[in-house]
């Protein structure tokens, strides 16, 4: 893969591998394995040619008896695993996002923190209290002022002041959660219901659930929600229903 070419990287959680695919044919062109269980989630930074994959542990959210503490760094051009960041004392790393300040923010579920990583040194430079040992996924507001974690079994969303690195509070939802998204205008956080095929729409101005949307013709709960960049559609996937819902 040359510096100016295109490529695709994928995480195989079941096989504990990282795959490099042909973006036209989707054929697997390179495989990197040998990781502890389990490779989880993915952050790609095209500008630097780097990708980051956390090692969560051998369980699932809320039931992870052997949590791990590593974040693996990949060179996209060389298709190589080039470094492993040790996050200890923080454990069970999961969702990670690139902040507006160029730092990486990653939930460390069992430690109830969002760890902050400097990409130049590949070191943990701070840890922010998330208020929950069930903080699984996170999102960052488009203006960079707030970070939100969805705290699965707790049925709450933590609100963090990102510049101050301070937990402001938690928003209660009617039931446990399985995913989170934020609208491109930053006015709405979507929390995905883990018990029913429903979405909770949270007003970021007052921190309250203002509406519930039932996913029609989806028999089981959903997990992942993503807005289109132009705010025109919200896509919601339900793994156990084999469905993708598109919401205007």
Please identify what each model-predicted range represents.
Residues 1-248:
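Predominantly soluble domains enriched in secretory-pathway, periplasmic, or organellar proteins
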